[in-house]
């Protein structure tokens, strides 16, 4: 069986800490896949100061999509609801697609905080491969697309108060949408991070990352209605955090 066939097999969903423990039972560390801001080692280290073994890898059977509303952009003052430029990034299964990612290890003790920080996502255990095609022998966690229904039932336990705690103060009633656009500061950051990883990662990000319509690539978006994004500087207080 080829590496790509192994890699595109149905990934295992990790619903809670016990699922993480079952998959990552050996050793004190858990592998994480970065595909957006975590393409930046600086960003990754700001979130996981004690991470180890930061490296570039390939993940078959997935694409990137700007299709989820992120409260953090509202909190940091960089969301633009009037133009719908409020989206963060997810990875979603897509046969025949490939994305360049980063992989690194975090301490298992960091998993509960990781789950809370990325609470809107579906966590999948995936098998990346090296850039020369050698399949990893251990899985990594990927933050994948979820649904509003799954978030409400699984993460919020069907409790509207929990949903409102996460999203209500920003008047967000739907997380997963196909009619929103990338947060400009965040998109610029991700592109710079990919560029810092080299030409292969840069071109992969431009051509295998899509708007919510799942047909417009980021390369096409930057050449049309998204033009000018790369020339815009982040607010002074966020220049380090969103500087690529």
Predicted regions: what they are:
Residues 2-244:
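Glycine-aromatic micro-motifs
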């Amino acid at each position: 069986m080829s590496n790509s066939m192994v890699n595109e097999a149905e990934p295992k969903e990790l619903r809670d800490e016990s699922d993480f423990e079952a998959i990552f039972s050996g050793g004190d560390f858990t592998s994480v896949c970065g595909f957006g801001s975590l393409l930046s080692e600086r960003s990754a280290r700001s979130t996981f100061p004690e991470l180890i073994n930061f490296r570039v890898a390939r993940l078959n059977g997935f694409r990137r999509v700007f299709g989820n509303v992120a409260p953090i952009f509202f909190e940091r003052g960089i969301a633009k609801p009037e133009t719908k430029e409020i989206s963060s990034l997810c990875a979603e299964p897509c046969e025949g697609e490939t994305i360049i990612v980063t992989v690194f290890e975090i301490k298992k003790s960091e998993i509960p905080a990781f789950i809370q920080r990325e609470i809107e996502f579906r966590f999948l255990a995936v098998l990346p491969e090296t850039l020369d095609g050698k399949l990893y022998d251990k899985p990594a966690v990927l933050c994948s697309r979820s649904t509003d229904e799954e978030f409400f039932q699984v993460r919020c336990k069907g409790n509207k108060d929990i949903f409102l705690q996460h999203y209500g103060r920003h008047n967000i009633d739907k997380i997963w949408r196909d009619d929103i656009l990338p947060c400009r500061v965040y998109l610029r950051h991700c592109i710079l991070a990919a560029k810092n990883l080299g030409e292969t990662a840069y071109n992969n990000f431009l051509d295998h990352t899509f708007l919510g319509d799942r047909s417009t690539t980021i390369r096409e978006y930057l050449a049309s209605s998204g033009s000018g994004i790369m020339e815009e500087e982040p607010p002074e207080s966020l220049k380090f955090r969103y500087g690529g």
